[in-house]
Amino acid sequence: MNWLALVLTAHLGQVDEAVAARFAKLALACVHREYPNKLAHVLSSPADAKVPSKLTPAFYGCYDWHSSVHGHWLLARLARTFPGAPFAADAKRALDKSLTAKNLAAEVAYVEGKGRVSFERPYGLAWLLQLSLELREWDDPDAKRWAKALEPLEAVAVKRLMEWLPKLSRPIRVGEHDQTAFAFGLALDWARGAGHRELEALLTERAQTYYSNDVSCPLAYEPGGQDFLSPCLAEADLMRRLLPKPRFAAWLSTFLPGFGDSKSLEPERVTDRSDPKLAHLDGLNLSRAWMLEGIRAGLPDDDARRAMIETAAQTHRAAGLEAVTGEHYEGGHWLGSFATYLVTARGLR
């Protein structure tokens, strides 16, 4: 049985070690690969013109900062899940190389630098919190040390979100990094896991304000040609985290009244995987799959929509995972993280 068949026939959240090794290999190949590199870098003086590893010495690989962060999360997630696997030792060595107190102090200094108040907000900050949560939950002495070293940067991420959200007058409803719904889900999971009641309360209030009265989300108009997140499904996946099942079912009926239309839930096809923006649609198939699984989990057991949602999730899962090959770095530097988030059912735990 090939690796894709192993994933597609496994129960939700169950992962074969061979599949995990495949995804770990992608992250190991990029977390310390400095080039090519796409910087989101504000320069305030000539002294700010430095190579990526000098600017952000923990998270300089995997093409961009946020992909490096979730590449490290992938390694932590899979090494935690498969501590005896051959790849686990390599994953821990990579984490140990990156997550030093010195490197992370430099990351704090960079993020707090002049002109960087919006750096990686909200997407990269949310993934940083997801990395922190993985390390916090991992019962391992090395993970505890890395989590401790990460705490100052974690605190900066929380502070940035808490300062920004009260001023954000509208949600950001796009299919790429700036989207608020997806980032809220990651940040909310961290706040609950870390016991940060203040951030949890703020995210809950903002989500209710932004989304609770939404109706008739135009799912049929999705996706944009370079989306990797569904605005409609991400919003629903967030709200199922906040509402009891009966209330979520009622909210979903008005938010997505045509949710039984399979035409709006067909996987997308990438026409050129060597194009970094067009390749986003492979990630969309993966994120749609886990969002559909989340929505299904948020509905009562007897809800008639569950069967259709499960079918749609499976078709998107198959289409998305088939693309996680590493053939092109444009997708190889990040799709493994999305695949890992999906197959380990991280959003449901």
Residue spans for each PLM region:
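Surface-exposed peri-terminal alpha-helical interaction modules
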Residues: 84, 100-103, 135-140, 155-158, ...
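Hydrophobic alpha-helical targeting segments used for export or membrane insertion
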Residues: 2-12
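Low-complexity, Ser/Thr/Pro/Gly-enriched N-terminal "stalk/linker" regions
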Residues: 13-60
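Long, repeat-rich segments with strong aromatic
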Residues: 192-328, 334
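HEAT/HEAT-like alpha-solenoid repeats
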Residues: 25-32, 36, 57-61, 96, ...
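Extended ligand-binding groove/face enriched in aromatic
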Residues: 54, 69, 78-194
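Well-ordered alpha-helical scaffold segments within catalytic/enzyme domains
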Residues: 12-15, 29, 69-85, 126-142, ...
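Solvent-exposed loop and edge beta-strand segments that line ligand/cofactor-binding
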Residues: 12-16, 52-69, 109-125, 167-180, ...
